[in-house]
Amino acid sequence: MKKKIALIYGGNSEEAGISIQSGRNVSRNICREKYDVYEVLLKGVDWLVMNPSGDAVQDDLPQRCLEALCAGEAAESVMAAGAGAPVRVDKCTFSFVHQGETVKFDMAFIMIHGTPGENGLLQGYFEMIGVPYNTCSAYVSAITFDKHSCKRFIEHAGVKMAKDVFIRRGSSYNPEEIIGELGLPVFVKPTNGGSSFGITKVKRVEDLEAAVELVFKEYDSVIIEESIVGRELTNGIYANGSELVKLPVTEIVTTREFFDYEAKYLGESQEICPAHIPDELTARIQQTTEKIYRYMGCSGLVRMDYIVRDGEIFFLETNTVPGMTPMSLVPAQVRAAGISMEEFVNTLIENIC
């Protein structure tokens, strides 16, 4: 009997639309001979099965439903499209009812970028109800999603990182002292944002306070990091049984100030994979990726981002639910490794505990 997979996308962050694209791309590559795939759009308390019949999902349905929910429409109006319309997930049993029959999910494939899919909340739910899933644990996801906590954890592994200052909303801070410690320019970031949303590059001390307060409009804490000028590189890694598979390294080249949302998703960057770097540097980056993966206790697919300056590798951040759109970094690394997307996705599923 085929196992039933809940492929979950959407979420409550600015990345919900990208999450849908990632999830749809994953869905297209799951082997239907082995699995029944149900796509689940999550937005707040609304968890809606897009294809309760198990048939293919209309291409624009998830995005239309997301936009309707974001506009304040009740989920019931989204679900009122007749036969084959979305239905609610029963969160107590992680199941749904279709034509009088209860369908219970066997496992979850989380493709939500940001909250609640990348910060441990959704993982905690699945751990409580005993449903296996594809990402890092709730504990590891919570640590890696918070840039400050992640850096404090990883620094004990002997990995180099940019110097930083952490500020929580309501705390006092002195811009001159911060710049005196970190120099200029600096990057001002929310500690728990994704896809470079809310990041500002500050070049003058008098602009620092405005950048910090801009973050505080949406987030409770901020991390200010020194700028390290170098080559931006990223590396994916995933578990296949007892083996850790390290994907080729990608170099990111952009004419923008940094690799922000526009550079990532609107084509304003060039991703070179495999990166045109010495084999020795590639090996050191992959070794660092494996070192962090093991030290953090990661599982599933993870992507690590770095800056390399004069041969020194500086860790930037860990992505525990990396983008999986056709133009995302990991799928490009998979192609460069000579692995088909279908083989890759089904390997990830087979390794769900």
Residues covered by each model-derived region:
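ATP-binding N-terminal substructure of ATP-dependent carboxylate-amine bond-forming enzymes
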Residues: 1-139, 143-145, 149, 156, ...
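Residue-level detector of anion-binding/catalytic polar loops
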Residues: 36, 132, 160, 221, ...
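ATP-dependent carboxylate activation and anion-phosphoryl transfer catalytic cores
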Residues: 3, 8-12, 279-353
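A glycine- and small-aliphatic-rich helix-loop capping segment at beta-alpha/alpha-beta transitions
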Residues: 124-133, 204, 209, 336-337
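Active-site nucleotide/adenylate-binding loops and adjacent lid/helix of ATP-dependent enzymes
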Residues: 2-9, 13-14, 21, 98-103, ...
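Phosphate-binding site of ATP-dependent enzymes
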Residues: 203-287, 308-314
